[in-house]
Amino acid sequence: MSKTSKAYRAAAAKVDRTNLYTPLQAAKLAKETSSTKQDATVEVAIRLGVDPRKADQMVRGTVNLPHGTGKTARVAVFAVGEKADAAVAAGADVVGSDDLIERIQGGWLEFDAAIATPDQMAKVGRIARVLGPRGLMPNPKTGTVTADVAKAVADIKGGKINFRVDKQANLHFVIGKASFDEKLLAENYGAAIDEVLRLKPSSSKGRYLKKITVSTTTGPGIPVDPSITRNFAGE
């Protein structure tokens, strides 16, 4: 939705920019300010008090959202033999090795997450410049370089999300769809924020969660109180 459109302005007028909403209030308001007919994605944007230029202040992690994202992720797996068979059985959308790498080198990128067995990483490294900038490069820290590919596929299909701070110290991740009940969105929010808090670098000084907004892909940002992570029972 264009930020100059009449519908967007009407939605933005519902948000009090001087107020910090609770997670539950923000989830409810995000639903109300999504004016698209499609089931919009609900997203969280966080400004962190870290310096991403410093290796010890990189914030990167994963979390299994208790209620999923509302979207079935398309998963690519780099594996051979029994591991490849296990990935297929677990529901991976595409499985391969050199053939899959060649396909990606040719421009095919129709997947949302990639998993690799450790023995495949030397080969996968050939497409690191393609996968890395898109957040698709398998990494042991996110559980996507693993011998247990079946579990990794199941986790991602079940609502596991990855997040990584960008160069501007921002984090972005999805917590569900506008069709979700606001309580479910708030619970997903709480699970994700708790993990972000757990990963706070010891070298990060001062305020860690500087600013948080919740919004749909078509709606205005709703400011959330950074001091509250779990507020499900009421407002």
UniProtKB/Swiss-Prot annotation:
Belongs to the universal ribosomal protein uL1 family. Pfam families: Ribosomal_L1 (PF00687). This is Large ribosomal subunit protein uL1. One of its GO terms (cellular component) is large ribosomal subunit. The keyword RNA-binding applies. Part of the 50S ribosomal subunit. GO terms for molecular function: rRNA binding; structural constituent of ribosome; tRNA binding. NCBIfam families: rplA_bact (TIGR01169). Keywords: Repressor, Ribonucleoprotein, Ribosomal protein, RNA-binding, rRNA-binding, Translation regulation, tRNA-binding. Binds directly to 23S rRNA. The L1 stalk is quite mobile in the ribosome, and is involved in E site tRNA release. Protein L1 is also a translational repressor protein, it controls the translation of the L11 operon by binding to its mRNA. InterPro entries: Ribosom_uL1_bac-type (IPR005878), Ribosomal_uL1 (IPR002143), Ribosomal_uL1-like (IPR023674), Ribosomal_uL1/biogenesis (IPR028364), Ribosomal_uL1_3-a/b-sand (IPR016095), Ribosomal_uL1_CS (IPR023673). The keyword Glycoprotein does not apply. CDD domains: Ribosomal_L1. GO terms for biological process: regulation of translation; translation. It comes from the Bacteria.
